[in-house]
Amino acid sequence: LDVLIGSLLGDGRLECRSVGKRQPITARFRVHHGEKQKEYVFWKYEMLNHFVSRKPQEITWENPKRNLREVSWYFHTRSSAELGIIYHYFYQGGLKILPETIDRFINPRSLAIWFMDDGSNSGTNFTINTHSFSLEEQKRVITLFKEQFGITGTIVKDRTKFKIAFGAGEYQKLAHIIQPHLIPSMNYKIVNPRNDFSNILLGGVAPILRRDS
């Protein structure tokens, strides 16, 4: 469940497979990440392979914004009524929303997966790209971080939308919570050679992680 929750807060999505008029609503879960995160895709696949019929597939596509040919990896689960129930909580009118009861399901592991999906590291702060959520939903996320993890976040403008930032002091708290749950290939999300805290957090392991990632 942590993989589903963390991914749905991030880049993952549920695709509704039936409207539920004469039968239960069904949905399937789709994972799609770029080539740099190939290992992360396969890690998610291993966590969910009892729901999946095919291994992750490679796809090549043209990115008009960057005028480049991109490579990415994806897989999806089989459709099920159980995922249809989760769809009901995470979607409204076909759009992803922040469930009212998200505080019951967020924990350090699902938070780490959310960060692996949407987190970034500037060397002096962390941000979570929460652009898909409304401003009111992001205010609820700020409250969630404060009440459940004791972390103070800030909503910052990012062009026409908003995201959540964690400045000096707070990002250290966040790193301590999520680092035990990060997979090795995603440690670059918190390890930065310009950031002395990385070495304190990961000790002698930090140089190895930087080489591996």
Predicted regions, residues:
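Internal intein/HINT superfamily modules and their associated LAGLIDADG
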Residues: L1-S213
